[in-house]
């Protein structure tokens, strides 16, 4: 498994809405993530700085990257773009993080 972590932002007035939209996520999005080898996906909110810290374990980079090309992922991005900074393709602005320590 490949462990990934990344940071995104949520608009200051949208913390509760962000959580509501993820409680639960669309079943078809959950299915696509699992079909593409995503496991143990978690998102944490730093409410003071409006940051979202995400971790996920994936089976391969290629399968993970392929999620972005699915119709359901593109609909999800469009659904979320009004409550978080987004790129021109509607994907959330995110910064991948480098792992510097892990204890199993």
From Swiss-Prot:
Pathway(s) the chain acts in: Carbohydrate metabolism; L-rhamnose metabolism
Keywords: Carbohydrate metabolism, Cytoplasm, Isomerase, Rhamnose metabolism
Catalytic activity: alpha-L-rhamnose = beta-L-rhamnose
Residues noted as binding substrate in the record, renumbered to the chain: 18, 41, 76-77
Biological processes per GO annotation: rhamnose catabolic process
Compartments where found: Cytoplasm
GO cellular component: cytoplasm
EC number(s) recorded for this UniProt protein: 5.1.3.32
Top-level taxon of the source organism: Bacteria
Gene Ontology MF: a single term: L-rhamnose mutarotase activity
Pfam hit, one: rhaM
Quaternary structure note: Homodimer.
Function statement: Involved in the anomeric conversion of L-rhamnose.
Protein name per UniProt: L-rhamnose mutarotase
Gene from which the chain derives: rhaM
């Amino acid at each position: 498994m490949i462990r990934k972590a990344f940071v995104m932002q949520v608009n200051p007035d949208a913390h509760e809405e962000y959580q509501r939209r993820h409680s639960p996520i669309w079943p078809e999005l959950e299915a696509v993530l699992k079909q593409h080898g995503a496991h143990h996906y978690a998102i944490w909110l730093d409410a003071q700085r409006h940051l979202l810290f995400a971790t996920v374990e994936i089976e391969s980079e290629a399968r993970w990257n392929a999620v972005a090309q699915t119709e359901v992922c593109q609909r999800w991005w469009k659904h979320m773009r009004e409550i978080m900074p987004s790129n021109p393709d509607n994907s959330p602005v995110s910064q991948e993080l480098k792992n510097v320590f892990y204890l199993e």
